[in-house]
Design a protein with these regions (language model features):
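Alpha-helical scaffold/interaction cores of sigma-54-like transcription cofactors
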Residues: 1-535
């Protein structure tokens, strides 16, 4: 999908819409070494009554040779193994060997993508011995092993007459594996452009071999595999075997380790903290009113299961203050909590200012509390490192975010690939600016602006190169261009991170999740915002 950065023009939402239109019942996501789009894909499939199959394309090493493998999760154990494998790939710069694969086979189906495999290279060099040895090793460790044949192979008479016959003699199972890197045949230009952008603006040689990597309709695929219908039947067989169930909406909160019952400890800290606060009040107050409010808030927090959440925030705020790291007085709805005020998390008395606790936390609205804490931007990392050390490297991570193609970036990159001169590029921007001078459109797509500008349409009609640049820029807008780190978000988990999300390298020796903040929150994980301010 689009989440194989600059390797695919296949956007998840339009892909699922197309699958639904074609009345297809299942689809497998197989990105290159990463699982960035897994949750979005899974949710979008379920929303449209299409069965999601979770997969991963793995590059592994064996005897100084590199081979590719497609792995699909049969069950949740397999899904866990995919997350481990993807994490290993990203954290070791794609350094996975055969021995590691042997340890992580449970719950997985393996498919050798013939056209991208070392087996094809061996056979084309008439080295059947090494080809079969490679296949036998894989067959030995994966109880469900297939050779996947794409359109290029199945329509190649030389392959069918020679190599296919040889492979069939060894009783391997075969499956149709038409690779999809872009949705419509007309999206080939967007795909080649993305690959060129990855290749420093230079079109990739031999990419014409990928022309068939679009989503073929059912009739076309049935025609292509007409003489090998068993391969199509195996796609259904595999889809039926794969039944990963990802749970959403259930909180997976970490525990604050104090050696005491969390709620009892929270209650004790709040009582001590509130007494200290009241001793410093310079205004009259009703003590009973404060304790009634405190007990009410504590009961709500306890009923909703958030005692540990408040203790975790209290702990790192206390660390910051103890180490002379300035902490903001509170922002958003958090200052409406007397518990937060009593713990020293915020500095605003919610009763004095008549702030409603329900704006912050409400039993009728099932959502995680959201306490954003401000730190000086030059000391924020100290607090994050403290949290990482306290809860362990395997339980604390930065959060992934994508840098996507915005209008200007898409046009600039396409102009570079197709060598559009500066004069024409400036002309495009002049008309783009003119069409939205009065901000009539809120965050418009490039396509919307072109449709609203007769001048841009005229340019496209008169100049083929401008037409090409703008047409492709429309197609790649909003596709991820690079990965980045969420400006403030940190996730803390109850158990090892890899039980919930695959991992990437992060900053300051702290891992980074492969899932975005929205995905992590859907999984019920605890996201906390450590905001860095200059002033």
């Amino acid at each position: 999908t689009e989440n194989s950065i600059l390797q695919s023009a296949c956007k998840i939402k339009p892909l699922i819409e197309k699958l639904k239109e074609q009345q297809l019942h299942s689809c497998a996501i197989v990105d290159e070494g990463t699982m960035y789009g897994t949750i979005k894909f899974y949710q979008e499939c379920n929303k449209n009554n299409i069965k999601p199959v979770i997969g991963l394309k793995v590059k592994y090493h064996y005897n100084d040779k590199t081979n590719n493998l497609v792995l699909l999760a049969i069950n949740n154990f397999g899904y866990q193994n995919l997350m481990k494998i993807s994490s290993r790939l990203q954290l070791t710069n794609n350094n996975i060997d055969f021995e590691y694969l042997q340890k992580t086979t449970m719950g997985l189906i393996a498919i050798l993508p013939y056209e991208e495999s070392i087996v094809q290279k061996y056979l084309e060099r008439n080295d059947a011995k090494n080809a079969i040895q490679t296949l036998e090793l894989l067959k030995e460790i994966y109880s469900d092993f297939y050779i996947g044949l794409g359109i290029k192979s199945i329509t190649n008479s030389n392959f069918i007459d020679n190599y296919f016959k040889l492979l069939k003699n060894y009783n391997y199972q075969f499956v149709a594996l038409p690779k999809v890197s872009f949705i419509n045949e007309s999206d080939y230009d967007a795909y080649t452009t993305l690959k060129a952008i990855k290749n420093n603006g230079v079109l990739v040689e031999g990419i014409e071999n990928d022309k068939n990597n679009y989503l073929h309709d059912v009739k076309s695929v049935e025609t292509i595999y007409y003489n090998h219908y068993d391969m199509l039947e195996n796609t259904t067989k595999i889809a039926n075997m794969c039944n990963v169930q990802i749970e959403f909406g259930k909180y997976q909160l970490p525990l604050y380790e104090s050696g005491l019952d969390s709620f009892a400890y929270l209650k004790e800290l709040c009582s001590i903290g509130l007494e200290k606060r009241m001793q410093n009040f310079e205004y009259s107050y009703d003590k009973r009113k404060y304790y009634d409010r405190l007990n009410y808030e504590l009961n709500v927090i306890n009923e909703m299961g958030f005692s540990d959440y408040f203790l975790i925030v209290y702990d790192y705020v206390k660390y910051a203050k103890k180490n002379n790291i300035f902490v903001g007085p509170g922002r958003g709805s958090a200052p409406a909590s007397l518990v937060a005020y009593s713990l020293g998390i915020t500095e605003i008395d919610p009763l004095y200012y008549n702030l409603l606790f329900e704006r912050f936390l409400n039993k009728e609205r099932l959502s995680m509390p959201d306490i954003d804490i401000d730190f000086p931007d030059d000391r924020r990392d100290e607090v994050i490192r403290y949290v990482g050390k306290k809860y362990g490297k395997n339980r604390v991570a930065h959060i992934l975010t994508f840098g996507t193609f915005k209008i200007r970036q898409a046009i600039n990159d396409c102009a570079r690939v197709f060598k559009l001169n500066d004069v024409k590029t400036k002309e495009i921007y002049k008309h783009l600016q003119a069409v939205n001078t009065y901000k009539v459109y809120d965050n418009p797509s490039l396509k919307t602006l072109i449709e609203a500008s007769s001048d841009l349409q005229l340019l496209m009609n008169n100049y083929e190169d401008i037409n090409k640049v703008l047409t492709i820029a429309c197609k790649i807008q909003d596709i991820p261009r690079n990965i980045s780190t969420h400006a403030a978000g940190i996730v803390i988990t109850k158990f090892d991170l890899v039980n919930y999300t695959p991992l990437d390298e992060g900053l300051d020796e702290i891992y980074q999740t492969q899932y975005e903040a929205k995905d992590l929150e859907a999984l019920g994980l605890l996201k906390m915002d450590f905001l860095g301010l200059k002033n």
